């Protein structure tokens, strides 16, 4: 049995992520999906909480025929210990899929098999672009699986994003 690890911020989860995960699912038996930067929320580039992102991913993958686990992963300030941090919070995995150069480097240095996951129509399926559309009041729902749009609407995520994107709210407490 082969279990893979794939991490993303999923701010929000979109069809690009969905295509990559579907492709990974063809190659492995189980998949651990890490919700990266889990401690971040209520910011312009990270508007959604870890729990909200877990729901987005879980609901979007409900019909995927692969056993999967969705695990929040907080950032650590030291890249040299990040892989150990990830491993300590997830079920064991055999292979890592990523297109992030730092993630690839860190996991390779730690002795993991790493496969690069190509971006899927990046210019269209980008969290940055989807958040921009939300802020500007443009259509965005067609860029995410329906269950993701439903999760975002359930807590009025677009209003939150608009509120935290205003200049007066861009400060840390």
Curated annotation (Swiss-Prot):
<dbReference type="Pfam" id="PF01467">
    <property type="entry name" value="CTP_transf_like"/>
</dbReference>
<dbReference type="GO" id="GO:0005737">
    <property type="term" value="C:cytoplasm"/>
</dbReference>
<dbReference type="GO" id="GO:0009435">
    <property type="term" value="P:NAD biosynthetic process"/>
</dbReference>
<dbReference type="GO" id="GO:0005524">
    <property type="term" value="F:ATP binding"/>
</dbReference>
<comment type="pathway">
    <text>Cofactor biosynthesis; NAD(+) biosynthesis; NAD(+) from nicotinamide D-ribonucleotide: step 1/1.</text>
</comment>
<keyword id="KW-0547">Nucleotide-binding</keyword>
<protein>
    <recommendedName>
        <fullName>Nicotinamide-nucleotide adenylyltransferase</fullName>
        <ecNumber>2.7.7.1</ecNumber>
    </recommendedName>
</protein>
<keyword id="KW-0662">Pyridine nucleotide biosynthesis</keyword>
<dbReference type="InterPro" id="IPR004821">
    <property type="entry name" value="Cyt_trans-like"/>
</dbReference>
<dbReference type="GO" id="GO:0000309">
    <property type="term" value="F:nicotinamide-nucleotide adenylyltransferase activity"/>
</dbReference>
<keyword id="KW-0548">Nucleotidyltransferase</keyword>
<keyword id="KW-0963">Cytoplasm</keyword>
<keyword id="KW-0808">Transferase</keyword>
<keyword id="KW-0067">ATP-binding</keyword>
<comment type="similarity">
    <text>Belongs to the archaeal NMN adenylyltransferase family.</text>
</comment>
<keyword id="KW-0520">NAD</keyword>
<dbReference type="InterPro" id="IPR014729">
    <property type="entry name" value="Rossmann-like_a/b/a_fold"/>
</dbReference>
<dbReference type="InterPro" id="IPR006418">
    <property type="entry name" value="NMN_Atrans_arc"/>
</dbReference>
């Amino acid at each position: 049995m082969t279990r893979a690890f794939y991490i993303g911020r999923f701010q929000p989860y979109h069809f690009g992520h969905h295509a990559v995960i579907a492709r990974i699912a063809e190659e492995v038996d189980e998949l651990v999906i890490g919700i990266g930067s889990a401690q971040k929320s209520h910011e312009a580039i990270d508007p959604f909480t870890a729990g909200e992102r877990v729901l987005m991913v879980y609901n979007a993958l409900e019909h995927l025929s692969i056993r999967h686990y969705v695990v929040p992963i907080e950032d650590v300030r030291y890249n040299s210990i990040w892989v150990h941090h990830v491993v300590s919070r997830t079920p064991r995995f055999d292979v890592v899929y990523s297109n992030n150069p730092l993630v690839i480097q860190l996991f390779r240095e730690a002795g993991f098999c790493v496969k690069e996951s190509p971006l899927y129509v990046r210019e269209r399926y980008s969290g940055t672009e989807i958040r921009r559309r939300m802020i500007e009041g443009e259509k965005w729902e067609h860029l995410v699986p329906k269950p993701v749009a439903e999760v975002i609407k359930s807590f009025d995520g677009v209003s939150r994003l608009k509120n935290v994107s205003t200049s007066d709210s861009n400060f840390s407490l």
